[in-house]
């Protein structure tokens, strides 16, 4: 979480964690691939860690995102993703490829239909 001054709030609440046990992921082509948990480099074994951020709650307040004018806007919080390089296994062949991970929590808004009766 970013540090906020008194009186400042996030529109959406997020939680960030280091993920060390990821075994599968989606690559850039949309294929599910096997992520190697342990990586052997020069006879040393390393774990792959991924820093992931996701939304705590899609609706931090009953109307959706915090601070959005619910009279004119529909809103909800959603997790977005990005691609990072990871050592993966495909058909007994290890290779570096980009995999999708959770990276942020953002607010999505859409205008409500105004009814002028």
Swiss-Prot record:
InterPro entries: Cystine-knot_cytokine, Nerve_growth_factor-like, Nerve_growth_factor-rel, Nerve_growth_factor_bsu, Nerve_growth_factor_CS. Expressed by the venom gland. One of its GO terms (biological process) is nerve development. GO terms for molecular function: growth factor activity; lipid binding; metalloendopeptidase inhibitor activity; nerve growth factor receptor binding; toxin activity. Disulfide bonds join 12-77, 55-105, 65-107. Pfam families: NGF (PF00243). Keywords: Disulfide bond, Glycoprotein, Growth factor, Lipid-binding, Metalloenzyme inhibitor, Metalloprotease inhibitor, Protease inhibitor, Secreted, Toxin. Glycans are attached at residue 21. It is found in: Secreted. The keyword Disulfide bond applies. One of its GO terms (cellular component) is dendrite. The keyword Cell wall biogenesis/degradation does not apply. Its main location: secreted. Coiled coil: none annotated. Nerve growth factor is important for the development and maintenance of the sympathetic and sensory nervous systems. It stimulates division and differentiation of sympathetic and embryonic sensory neurons as well as basal forebrain cholinergic neurons in the brain. Its relevance in the snake venom is not clear. However, it has been shown to inhibit metalloproteinase-dependent proteolysis of platelet glycoprotein Ib alpha, suggesting a metalloproteinase inhibition to prevent metalloprotease autodigestion and/or protection against prey proteases. Homodimer; non-covalently linked. Belongs to the NGF-beta family. This is Venom nerve growth factor. The lineage of its organism: Eukaryota, Metazoa, Chordata, Craniata, Vertebrata.
């Amino acid at each position: 979480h970013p540090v906020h001054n008194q009186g400042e709030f996030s529109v959406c609440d997020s939680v960030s964690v280091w993920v060390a046990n990821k075994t599968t992921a989606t690559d850039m082509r949309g294929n599910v691939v096997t992520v190697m948990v342990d990586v052997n480099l020069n006879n040393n074994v390393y774990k792959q860690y991924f820093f992931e951020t996701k939304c705590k709650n899609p609706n931090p307040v009953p109307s959706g995102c915090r601070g959005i004018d619910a009279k004119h806007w529909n809103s909800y919080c959603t997790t977005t993703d990005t691609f990072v390089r990871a050592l993966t296994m495909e058909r007994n062949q290890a290779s570096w490829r980009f995999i999708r991970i959770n990276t942020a929590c953002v607010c999505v808004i859409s205008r409500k239909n105004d009814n002028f009766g």
